[in-house]
């Protein structure tokens, strides 16, 4: 007998969440309600049989630009940013555990007793066994964003797509906040993004994805059900890939 349940379009994904997404309506830090909602949405994916790798930014806890302008060394600022992503990772791991989802937190910098150090083979093995793996501390190197970390880990774990959860519905022709006439792209290729100078990710992250033909889907993480819709192959957000037919 054929199953009537629709199957997910992806088997293994890398989900990138901005630190700001965790703030919700708070001016700073982590909004517990948002954290729990995201944990529930991730739980839905796990229950559908999707293998989930997760990278979270740190902008809700630490922003290096202001301190850099005041003279702080960029490397020091980036190290602080990496630790902010570990704090977000700890919060997310805890939220997932409270939602009865098995999750493991890995860090690109060694933090004995707090979380595991990043190990590629172990990450693959955990994903295969249905655990959510949270990759924190970025790439472990300064001058690289968490978007670069998301693309790097996505390539390493052979994710089929990087899903970038943002505060807007996808990639627009212009800033939708300042220009209400900006149009939302449904499907666009890497070269068009570069040519039109659309802000999706920093160049290092974006070219890494392009060079490895890793598709990126940008969607609104604050829209309930959007993540599931993406996983089920619906036209949610913007798909960036090699060909945009």
UniProtKB/Swiss-Prot annotation:
Keywords in alphabetical order: ATP-binding, Cytoplasm, Kinase, Nucleotide-binding, Pyrimidine biosynthesis, Transferase
Keyword ATP-binding recorded: yes
SUPFAM superfamilies according to UniProt: Carbamate kinase-like (SSF53633)
Gene name of the encoded protein: pyrH
Residues that, per the record, bind ATP: 16-19, 59, 63, 166, 172, 175
Activity: how regulated: Inhibited by UTP.
Species whose genome carries this gene: Idiomarina loihiensis (strain ATCC BAA-735 / DSM 15497 / L2-TR)
Cytoplasm recorded as keyword: yes
Subunit (UniProt): Homohexamer.
Record-listed E.C. numbers: 2.7.4.22
Entry similarity comment: Belongs to the UMP kinase family.
Parts forming coiled coils: none
Any Gene Ontology CC annotation: cytosol
Gene3D superfamilies listed in its UniProt record: Acetylglutamate kinase-like
Database matches in Pfam families: AA_kinase (PF00696)
Main location: cytoplasm
This protein's name: Uridylate kinase
Pathway assignment: Pyrimidine metabolism; CTP biosynthesis via de novo pathway; UDP from UMP (UMPK route): step 1/1
